[in-house]
Amino acid sequence: MKTDELREKYLAFFETKGCVRQPSDVLVPAWDPSVLFTPAGMNQFKDHFLGKVKLDFTRATTCQKCLRTGDIDNVGRTAFHHTFFEMLGNFSFGDYFKEEAIHWAWEFLTDKKWLGIPGERLTVTVYKDDDEAFGIWHDKIGLPTQRISRMDEDENFWPASAPSEGPDGVCGPCSEIYYQLEDGSDVEIWNLVFTQFNRVGTPPDNLHPLPSKNIDTGMGLERTASVLQGVPTNFHIDSLFPIVEAASEVCGVKYEYESDNGRRLRRITDHARASVFAVHENVYPGPKDARSVIRRLIRRAVLDGYQMNLREPFLYKLVEAVADASKAAYPELGQTTQRVSEAIESEEKAFFSTIDGGMKRIHRLFEEMNDEASVMVPGAEAADLLTTYGVPPELVQTLAAEQNFTFDWSGFREAMDKHADESDGGQRVLFQTGPLETLKEALRETPFVGYEQTEATAVVKGIITGDGKGKGDDGQLLSHLDRPEDAVLRLVLDHSPFYGESGGQVGDIGVISNDNFEFEVIDTQRHASMIVHHGRLIRGKINEGETCTAKVDVENRTALARAHSATHILHHALHTHVGRHAEQQGSKVEPDRLRFDFTNPKAIDDETLVKIEQDVLGMVGKGDEIRWDTVSLADAREAGAMMLFGEKYPDPCRMVSMGTFSRELCGGTHLTNTKQVGSFEVVVEESVSTGTRRIEALTGERAKEHREQTQALLNEVAGKLNCDASVAAAATVALIEEVRRLKKELSSGKAADYPAEFVFDAKAAKAETTDISDYNAVRAAVRGLTRRLNVAITDVLSRLDSLLADRSKLVEQLKQVTAGGKISADDLIADGTKVGDTLLIVAETPGANPNIMRGWIDQIRKKSDTPTAVLLASSMNDKVMLVGGLSRDLVDRGLKAGDWVGAAAKVVGGSGGGRPDMAQAGGKDASKLPEALQQARETMTEKLG
């Protein structure tokens, strides 16, 4: 049965059961901020399941486009995992329930009129306490007990483990249907979820029956198609294999199921399909949110191509194949193939330009590890390679193994947890009815009165424990709080002058109080239409319903307004000096500090930055009026107000105008006159991602302080480098290059003579000078310093200290290398001993780094005409480095260099390993090196004897 036929049969079958056929929801549901992508068929019905919205029908059926990345590492490796897939579903909103859902699933699967799957090939699971579902399967369907498995809540409850672990909200047991493959293994094809409980609190007795029970079922289209078509994987079904074949042709690689390239072609197929569907819906690859997921998918596919020796964009050539394979159900894909192809090709080009950078970064990392005698690739480094260059950890691990390094998976996962919210693809759908949702139903909204006033009399409407910043809000709604505590609480008032964080502007701070209590507000957030005050009760006790005074910190609010108004002025200046294409891509407004992201393909040079800054200061100095008006969207457009693409604006809306030069739709707080911005200073201009730049700037007193700090910095740098301030920037560059040169010489084993202290001869270097009387010249020099040192201005001096310390260590190590350089492979062979037919060499080689020691071992093995076992060691700065090698004939006898070196490393407080013929390790206790060498000598002598 073809995939298109299966899809239609499913929908038609459930139409015969009274279900209304509904279209697939979009991949990125703008109405649902809890997910990045639609992860399941029921997502579009969340509000209906919760009873918030009433439908004209109580039964529905859909085929939903879904995208998840939770199992991304399995894509291409397993038979059934995808990122993009289609989920067939049938739903009940307080209508049919368990018995009908089970009967209809069985009928559709086994009746010859529909799929005709032999019933004896099917087994089911139920939740261990769901006797009702067990009884239906056993007594009414007729399945024998041995084909019905009772499972724990982690397997057969939705959400998984909800009874014991939460979250609170709608939940229920589920029943899964499995098909037995020819090899005897089972594949899940259908999941029936019986949402019949509302979880409240901790067990026991925390599952309360819902007055209206619901059904949510899902059948994987691709999995079921593979079963019906009798193919080994989802990738071999009629709607996917043509894309696999197209990928094989485009990549110039034969498709073989079991090969590494076969896995790569399957992964390319999946990621191409996901990217085409997403970009078709205007989800372009980018740095944040859903866009970052699409970027990751495209880059993973490109890396697979890179490993098959492709060096030019290729993925975009599969767009037509994806559209053609999907045309029966999604003919609209064919209308946007050119736009989608161009977007994917552009991302490929950008990534191909960074792949080499990523590989160079890996090689530099390996060199540093050799220098430091490290044996494990740090997880944080691998995470940075993934997030910066898109290099997957699996590739890093493979390359590391070739260098006898291991890989820190736990550290990698810990580092990647910081990116989870933007990379997990929103794979879970939770019906959590937390305290804010409960409060919202009663309060509806919190009117904001802060445009007109910074102090207001209000009534406490909600007291909530916790800060609510985790993935699930487990806070409690209280009626009162009797004593102060350090934990963060949340207050909701009937109205508020506090601005809740939105539009890039951070929330207000201040105090909410009366005679009975004082609540310090440390942050203000928006939750839908409610303003939520985060803070601590520092005095007294607080009760719901009491009247209080909400007072915003005016000084902080004014500093925010300075930065926000300056952001609008900066936006105008960018249009003037960079171009109209420099549109806002994101912003953050903090007290007297702003961050503004905008579209631009290249860096802004210092000369243009000065012009932008002077233009902003000129508009500030004019003292134009800043005003805001509530207008209709139509009037705002007619007035030429700037609107951000893709942003949803209310109608009517708030338009902020500055003189005659700027009009933007904005809900933030502003000054009343541009002159109130005071000073303005650009401190950073940098890349955020391909095609997106970022400017950070300061306003008010912070800008003045930064200016003074900048003017003083060159003198401080000059003092550290013992040179004139006019050449301090050039001296810093010379120091960086000298440290790099020292590392290279140390790595290669070359020894040169360097003075103990850093000396910069400006005349000999023909150094470029800075006019220290010209602030713009000074600032340009300081910006150059921060770029070369890759630090903020506040960290320049500490980074210089670090570089000078590194230089001193490297010079000292080079002296040791000079001593070690007198050793040769012939010397080591001469000092070796014969154990049976084997030449055994165990020696300390002072000053030698792992590269040098590996070189000696290779030379010894080539020179020796007998079996050879070599272990060399050196120590620097109390760190021990060990490298061991065995000739091929010893490896064939079952000996392993990794075991030998690893045992010696334990003696010096370290660890290591590698290939059977070559391994290295590091240690922390240089005092025990003689003991380690003696043990290595005795261990190998015993093995050879």
Curated annotation (Swiss-Prot):
Gene3D superfamilies: 2.40.30.130, 3.10.310.40, 3.30.54.20, Bira Bifunctional Protein, Domain 2, Threonyl-trna Synthetase, Chain A, domain 2. Binds 1 zinc ion per subunit. It is found in: Cytoplasm. Its main location: cytoplasm. It holds the Pfam family DHHA1. Its cofactor is Zn(2+). Consists of three domains; the N-terminal catalytic domain, the editing domain and the C-terminal C-Ala domain. The editing domain removes incorrectly charged amino acids, while the C-Ala domain, along with tRNA(Ala), serves as a bridge to cooperatively bring together the editing and aminoacylation centers thus stimulating deacylation of misacylated tRNAs. This is Alanine--tRNA ligase. The gene is alaS.
